[in-house]
């Protein structure tokens, strides 16, 4: 079987014989040297892809914010199994309509990619189909934008049939407008009537039709899954439903495991949870259902929001939301705003909400952002105040917010009993309002505290 090489020059094969021997001499030279060595060994491990990151922020954006966004993009790349080698930043009033970055920056990226043998370039924004084609033609490596990277991570995380269908639908919707020029054979024609002389149907038309048919099939399948999920949720009548919401990687699954004593997958990576998980919990004879839902993120692809309708219905139909925030993250306030905006988009922003700040054990009020190599045109915010202490934040948020606020550490189990007590009070109050005859031994006095 012929070996296929990707755009970055790496070779992949199903054979256990690696393209390069373990004497650190890669490629054809390494194979020739290995032939002369009967004791030569081969590294059969799958090589991780390497990438550079590219961001085009507004000229007024502070450097600390730009770095924060690139840190998140690097975390996404790491979650997808990619090693990030370098970061490129170009400040423009607006991205170049043809190649997103300017001509000089594109030449700089190309020189670095060729010199280091990089296999992928990842952009922190969505690229148009024409920009994608122009960049691939110029850089001759794989080009990935933010949406495709997130969709790829979702594809690796999805376990249930519903989640897999949702991700596949998002993939096809992303692919459809980008079919032109995707394969070299698309200029050929297929068909042409009985005499084979007509213009026929070009392969691009055929491929588009195949993708559209697949999208229609997946939408029908998801409608069936929605009906099943709706039936399951209807069968949960008579019990209060609570949903954990928040930015990705804030510790929702860890909290879920603590409260429900279950074993939901939790990992220090983005989008560890894609499938929603529901557990029945009872505190002080007050039963309720707790849902762990998919995390939100800045610039979450609209296709994913649309595709994950049935999963997000767990949030829409919840009686109480627990908004979990990673207080150790320097941009946690922006993350709160992103989650609130996404809740508005899915029409769930008007629900009762508890705000829970997690990871207080990792909070550092004097942490300064370290500068990364590869930045140019620095635009530092010299007037930015020092981060407040944890005590100052507690006083501030407890004073200015009407909703209850709690500060915890799920990892270190700090203030978890307080979280249980807070949940119990609010769930019991909702339960008493809706189902006054089903609270068992829980007293009305406790509910009304």
Feature locations, PLM:
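Conserved nucleotide-binding/hydrolysis micro-motifs of P-loop NTPases
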Residues: 57-61, 92-94, 126-129, 148-151, ...
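Switch II of P-loop NTPase G domains
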Residues: 27-43, 67-71, 94-111, 275, ...
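Short alpha-helix plus adjacent loop in nuclease-associated cores
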Residues: 148-167
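Conserved C-terminal guanine-recognition region of P-loop GTPase G domains, centered on the G4
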Residues: 62, 70, 74-78, 110-115, ...
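Switch I (effector-binding) loop of TRAFAC-class P-loop GTPase G-domains
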Residues: 36-37, 234-237, 259-288, 302-307, ...
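N-terminal accessory targeting/assembly segments
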Residues: 1-146, 150
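C-terminal-of-GTPase-core extension/linker across diverse P-loop GTPases
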Residues: 1-52, 173, 177-250, 256-257, ...
């Amino acid at each position: 079987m012929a070996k296929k090489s990707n755009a970055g020059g790496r070779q992949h094969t199903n054979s256990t014989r690696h393209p390069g021997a373990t004497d650190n001499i890669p490629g054809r030279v390494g194979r020739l040297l290995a032939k002369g060595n009967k004791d030569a060994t081969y590294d059969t491990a799958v090589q991780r892809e390497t990438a550079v990151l590219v961001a085009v922020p507004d000229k007024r954006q502070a450097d600390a914010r730009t770095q924060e966004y690139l840190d998140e993009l690097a975390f996404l790349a790491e979650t997808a199994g990619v090693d990030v080698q370098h970061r490129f930043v170009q400040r423009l009033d607006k991205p170049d309509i043809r190649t997103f970055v300017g001509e000089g920056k594109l030449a700089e990226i190309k020189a670095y990619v060729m010199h280091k043998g990089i296999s992928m370039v990842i952009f922190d924004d969505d690229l148009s189909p024409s920009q994608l084609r122009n960049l691939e033609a110029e850089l001759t490596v794989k080009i990935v934008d933010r949406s495709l990277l997130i969709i790829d991570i979702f594809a690796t995380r999805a376990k249930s049939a519903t989640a897999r269908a949702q991700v596949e639908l998002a993939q096809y919707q992303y692919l459809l407008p980008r079919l032109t020029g995707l394969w070299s054979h698309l200029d050929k024609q297929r068909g042409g009537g009985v005499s084979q002389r007509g213009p026929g149907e070009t392969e691009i038309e055929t491929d588009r039709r195949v993708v559209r048919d697949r999208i229609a099939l997946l939408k029908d399948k998801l409608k069936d899954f929605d009906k099943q999920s709706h039936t399951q949720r209807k069968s949960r009548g008579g019990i209060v439903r609570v949903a954990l919401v928040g930015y990705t990687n804030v510790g929702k699954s860890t909290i879920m495991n603590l409260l429900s004593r279950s074993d939901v997958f939790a990992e220090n990576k983005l989008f560890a949870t894609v499938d929603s998980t529901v557990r029945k919990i009872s505190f002080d004879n007050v039963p309720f259902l707790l849902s762990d839902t998919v995390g939100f993120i800045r610039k979450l692809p609209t296709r994913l929001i649309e595709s994950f309708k049935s999963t997000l219905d767990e949030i829409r139909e919840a009686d109480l939301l627990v908004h979990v925030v990673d207080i150790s993250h320097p941009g946690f306030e922006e993350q709160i705003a992103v989650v609130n905006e996404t809740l508005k988009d899915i029409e769930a922003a008007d629900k009762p909400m508890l705000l829970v700040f997690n990871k207080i054990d990792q909070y550092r009020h004097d942490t300064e952002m370290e500068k990364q190599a590869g930045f140019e045109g620095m635009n530092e915010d010299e007037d930015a105040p020092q981060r407040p202490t944890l005590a100052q934040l507690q006083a501030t948020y407890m004073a200015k917010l009407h909703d209850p606020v709690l500060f915890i550490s799920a990892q270190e189990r700090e203030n978890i009993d307080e979280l249980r007590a807070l949940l119990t009070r609010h769930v019991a109050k909702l339960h008493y309002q809706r189902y006054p005859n089903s609270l068992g031994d829980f007293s009305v006095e406790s509910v009304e505290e």
